[in-house]
């Protein structure tokens, strides 16, 4: 199964694509889709949509996992991230992909085994689980891989029951 994990953001939207076959996990790609503040909001959202659509075409994921928006001190920022998340979900829906959402707590539990894990602990586990040479950069890419791993774990548990 190929899982595309997404960490929504308007300036940097992280993606992490893994291949999960049984207990074997392999990182196929990770990175960020960047937009720039001098672009209009519409152009930025279109860029995110196109970028995710291109990744879907290239990697043909079976499913998409998205990190849920938890909270933001700035409501304007929360709104922009929510718009980016909507565009990501639309791209997945246009490709008939099932979408799963995970909270940051669920991602930490799925990757590290406990919900109070630090960002650094999650990144180290992503590196270890996927047998990577180094922690993926930027953080948004590592976060997206963590979302993919969380879904892989949740899927394995669901299919065993």
From Swiss-Prot:
* The record's free-text note on cofactor binding: Binds 2 Mg(2+) ion per subunit.
Q: Could you tell me the keywords of this UniProt record?
A: Cytoplasm, DNA damage, DNA recombination, DNA repair, DNA-binding, Endonuclease, Hydrolase, Magnesium, Metal-binding, Nuclease
Q: Name one GO molecular function term.
A: crossover junction DNA endonuclease activity
Needed cofactors:
Mg(2+)
Task: Name where it's found.
Answer: Cytoplasm
Enzyme Commission designation: 3.1.21.10
Reaction catalysis annotation:
Endonucleolytic cleavage at a junction such as a reciprocal single-stranded crossover between two homologous DNA duplexes (Holliday junction)
According to the UniProt record, what class of enzyme is this?
Answer: hydrolase
Task: Please cite one Gene Ontology biological process associated with this protein.
Answer: DNA recombination
- Family matches, as Gene3D superfamilies: Ribonuclease H-like superfamily/Ribonuclease H
Q: Per UniProt, where does Mg(2+) 1 bind? A: 7, 140
* Record-linked SUPFAM superfamilies: Ribonuclease H-like
Record-annotated active site: 7, 67, 140
Instruction: Describe its function.
Output: The RuvA-RuvB-RuvC complex processes Holliday junction (HJ) DNA during genetic recombination and DNA repair. Endonuclease that resolves HJ intermediates. Cleaves cruciform DNA by making single-stranded nicks across the HJ at symmetrical positions within the homologous arms, yielding a 5'-phosphate and a 3'-hydroxyl group; requires a central core of homology in the junction. The consensus cleavage sequence is 5'-(A/T)TT(C/G)-3'. Cleavage occurs on the 3'-side of the TT dinucleotide at the point of strand exchange.
Assembly, per entry: Homodimer which binds Holliday junction (HJ) DNA. The HJ becomes 2-fold symmetrical on binding to RuvC with unstacked arms; it has a different conformation from HJ DNA in complex with RuvA. In the full resolvosome a probable DNA-RuvA(4)-RuvB(12)-RuvC(2) complex forms which resolves the HJ.
Family note: Belongs to the RuvC family.
What this protein is called in its record is Crossover junction endodeoxyribonuclease RuvC
What taxonomic ancestry is recorded?
Bacteria, Bacillati, Bacillota, Clostridia, Natranaerobiales
